[in-house]
Amino acid sequence: SGGFDFSFLPQPPQEKGDGKGVGLGPGPMGLMGPRGPPGASFQGPAGEPGEPGQTGPAGARGPAGPPGKAGEDGHPGKPGRPGERGVVGPQGARGFPGTPGLPGFKGIRGHNGLDGLKGQAGAPGVKTGARGLPGERGRVGAPGPAGARGSDGSVGPVGPAGPIGSAGPPGFPGAPGPKGELGPVGNPGPAGPAGPRGEQGLPGVSGPVGPPGKGAAGLPGVAGAPGLPGPRGIPGPVGAVGATGARGLVGEPGPAGSKGESGNKGEPGSAGPQGPPGPSGEEGKRGPSGESGSTGPTGPPGLRGGPGSRGLPGADGRAGVMGPAGSRGASGPAGVRGPSGDTGRPGEPGLMGRGLPGSPGNTGPAGKEGPVGLPGIDGRPGPVGPAGPRGEAGNIGFPGPKGPTGDPGKGEKGHAGLAGNRGAPGPDGNNGAQGPPGLQGVQGGKGEQGPAGPPGFQGLPGPSGTTGEAGKPGERGIHGEFGLPGPAGPRGERGPPGESGAAGPVGPIGSRGPSGPPGPDGNKGEPGVVGAPGTAGPGSGGLPGERGAAGIPGGKGEKGETGLRGEVGTTGRDGARGAPGAVGAPGPAGATGDRGEAGAAGPAGPAGPRGSPGERGEVGPAGPNGFAGPAGAAGQPGAKGERGTKGPKGENGIVGPTGPVGAAGPSGPNGAPGPAGGRGDGGPPGLTGFPGAAGRTGPPGPSGITGPPGPPGAAGKEGLRGPRGDQGPVGRTGETGAGGPPGFAGEKGPSGEPGTAGPPGTAGPQGLLGAPGILGLPGSRGERGLPGVAGAVGEPGPLGISGPPGARGPPGAVGPGVNGAPGEAGRSDGPPGRDGLPGHKGERGYAGNAGPVGAAGAPGPHGTVGPAGKHGNRGEPGPAGSVGPVGAVGPRGPSGPQGVRGDKGEAGDKGPRGLPGLKGHNGLQGLPGLAGQHGDQGSPGPVGPAGPRGPAGPSGPAGKDGRTGHPGAVGPAGVRGSQGSQGPSGPAGPPGPPGPPGASGGGYDFGYEGDFYRA
């Protein structure tokens, strides 16, 4: 027991046990001998270094010296070098949907695009035939190829602030955000409450004797010869039962178990959730032309529409298809060529005529984006398309945010192991003191991936993500069924004026009508002075006058010179609707006027009837992951998931300073051993004594039966951040989990900067003519547009060859001019008059006031089809016409051919930071991993802090009253818990509410052979 301290001698290496010996535990505890006197330390003169001798046998460990004084605080170390950049981790799991972000502000108006390219001249039209009956509404034809995008125009004036739009459908969940920077070290928190009683840990490995107190280090002396162990002391009296030791550290994992027997074949699992959409497949080759489909059944009669508002002036119609050939009549005698007649009146509107489709026009400038339309009814699922080729692996995503700390789980009671064979009794060991905590074990390997947990509850929709790159153009979807056309929407905003288009070819010369009787020569009047326009009086507009009786149509006067342009007068009130007048002879076609000012947008029309559900299109390519939104509100607790695999062992926290040890009390004299008394009541736990000498390690005892798990301990305080560990190896990409159901559609993010225009796409092949579609309901009439500015007079074309005389048309309607005073009645008994000489060309009069708009006349009876006239000479192209007003909205055409992918757009501005999310659910505790093999004994670690207080031991005899020790220092904060595992994806939420009705764009419709085109 006395003698020198041999703790500085090298210890023999500990042999690694195979873990197969089983005994009934260590032998009975030996009696503690009396404490020997402290060994005298001496320092010999420094000798010359000798040859390294062989390692002698290990001497007995001497008793522990008195504890040294607490060392002074050391100087803070130099800041470490910045760590190397870590390897990009695998793509994190999909984060919880964040809370919906606040609606963004309305963006400023974009630049007006440049005028579109000048269109090519159309092909010459076909000879006009008789107007056929209107055909049934055709299907939507394939759209023309997309035109090249114009460069950005100058910034337009800032328009008035529009009304706040209704909230759009919720956005897709954002992708996990990047890992935040390290925050500053927080102040140490207050001490937490005492945790519940912990489980009894495995006995720790005896640690080395603590370092001596702070003192000047002496010169190393010559290694002396190992001393002989002293004689064994006289056994002392039986000591009192000590308090239960502190909870030991968790032992190293045991060796891997042997492979178990094959289990029974399980029942077939239920069908997994729908997988995520596959990547966009490559554009397939053009398939062969399909067979002509049979005519579908006649659709149900449409609902009777209400009378619509007055429509906008329609665009110029295209040349109709030549009508059916009439029955051949008897050849008449050749007539004498008559003089050139006046231009005939326009023909009556044909009933259900079918025009040939014209050449595809150039794409106009892109209109403004309309509001979100009403969501359609879920379409019927279309046929499953062929599986596309496997896409390239995506980029590794950002690591997901760190999950919250999971609540401690309650493990189930394990099965009791088989009792091992009885081991040989070990030698009596000295009663060793509790050693310091052992070294950190080797990190366990990655466990196998556990089965997918049940789907969680639907999370809240995340905030709108930043605008991602434009996705690859999707494949063309299957044509949906034609729904009933909705009513025409409100008139869209006026687009920028396009360039003047090329003049179309001169149409065929119409049939000549009979020459009317020339009128009497009028007296040439002197042009009066142009009066200034009068201002509108304060009174209200007068009542509309009644329409006068139809006058006798006068002879066609010669074209007068262009008069001075009068100032625009105030708009008069609409006159009462007059009786339908007779159709007048058409005047010469005026030049197309310049485009008028855009009128104010009319009120939104009522929502149309819900269309029939379209067929479901093919699944588009998955977009890139957005950034992670803030955590959403806590959902309902999910079902208990299956137990996950055991995670890697966490790093040890920074060891806190050891508190001062209290002064030892005086030892009392040893009394004579008395007779063994009865077991006394349990006394209070004694103070922790000085650490005794470490005894020799006995043989390992048998494995005890695993006891029931104790109650979960309280959550520890968050400790200081540990030093950065070494960079670990790149983990293998885990298996792709089952795709969760699609989430809500996210809110519309801010529009990104416009990308550069891609090259113009090539025209797609001409599609097959479809079967005639269902006749749609008539749309509501749009509001009347503002009158356009009068156009310049065009150059007269060359005179065409006169055609044969046509049938005489009905008398024309009264012109807009003021009715002349009735002339004096002529004599009825006079001779018949002769044709007078042609009158002199009169000067052009001033523009008359605009009369009220007359109602459309009733369609007249069908005239007989006249013989076709000869083709006239091709006229000179007239002046460029201005763009007509936007027509009513036609139904949406099918998707066009896949265009060339555009360049990547510029990144949008960073959105505002989202609201902080609520704390998520805690993960479940994983199963303990298999015990690993014992590692080699590590080097002694530093003295750790005192372990937690163990449970109360059995009652011992009453101890003597000791002196009160000094109060201990505040212990360090605990190590932060490990990160919880990512929970499974939640199930698909309910569909979002329908959005507001969208504004309809412009366009005009024309049908052909049952196909419905939209311009």
Swiss-Prot record:
Residues 987-997 have a biased composition (Pro residues). InterPro entries: Collagen (IPR008160), Collagen_superfamily (IPR050149). It is found in: Secreted; Secreted, Extracellular space; Secreted, Extracellular space, Extracellular matrix. Keywords: Extinct organism protein, Extracellular matrix, Glycoprotein, Hydroxylation, Secreted. Residues 1-1015 are annotated as: Disordered. Expressed in bones. Residues 20-30, 302-311, 441-450, 534-545, 674-686, 734-743 have a biased composition (Gly residues). Prolines at the third position of the tripeptide repeating unit (G-X-Y) are hydroxylated in some or all of the chains. Signal peptide: none annotated. The modification 5-hydroxylysine is found at K106. Glycans are attached at K106. Residues 43-69, 140-169, 194-208, 235-250, 324-340, 497-514, 568-612, 619-639, 657-670, 687-697, 751-778, 786-799, 846-868, 877-897 have a biased composition (Low complexity). GO terms for cellular component: extracellular matrix; extracellular space. Residues 70-84, 640-649, 901-912 have a biased composition (Basic and acidic residues). The modification 4-hydroxyproline is found at P10, P13, P38, P346, P349. Trimers of one alpha 2(I) and two alpha 1(I) chains. Interacts (via C-terminus) with TMEM131 (via PapD-L domain); the interaction is direct and is involved in assembly and TRAPPIII ER-to-Golgi transport complex-dependent secretion of collagen. Belongs to the fibrillar collagen family. Type I collagen is a member of group I collagen (fibrillar forming collagen). These protein fragments were extracted from an ancient scute bone collected at Camet Norte in Argentina. This is Collagen alpha-2(I) chain. It comes from Doedicurus sp. (South American giant glyptodont).
